[in-house]
Amino acid sequence: MIDRLRQQVSVCELCNLHKTRVNPVFDKGNSNAILMICGMVPAHDENMQGVPFVGRAGKLLDKILVAAGLTYDDVYITNLVKCFVAAGQSLEKHWVESCRPYLTKQINIIKPHVIITLGADSSRSLCDLAGNMPMKNMRGRILHYSRNTMIVPTYHPSYLLRKGGVKSEQYIEVLEDFNLAKKCLKEMIKMATYT
């Protein structure tokens, strides 16, 4: 099922981003994972390789995963938007809406218990949060996506890079959020065994 969806994304022309992409960026990690990570948009390196989180932000995400005691076998990684958006370009609502059915299908196929959303845009989109609530007010909480899936919003690694990377205050907060996601995951697994 996930391979069929990946193929659909590879030929997608629902918005104008397909004209400037080199490769659509679909996923990375374990498609059987119960922990999903959802970023925002592919950057240049991701566009070139067709894989999410392979650039500088990806290298920082690697460090975050290690610090949180996770590997790529533990997580499934995707983005809100599947095609390259140039640095500094504002995320347009119709791009998100064009990709939303793909992300929804990914979530329905993977069936994660917890989704860690990286960045304000992916957090707002998946949590249906309106307005401009800052990430500092979203993070550190568990939000409901569906009956069987929770969301833990946190900062995007690219934001951390602008704030000083692993030396930033926000890096510690991201680790707290990843640990919150792991704790939530354990609770959901425990609840599932009793139902």
Protein language model features and the residues they cover:
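A polyanion-binding, active-site-adjacent surface
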Residues: 1-195
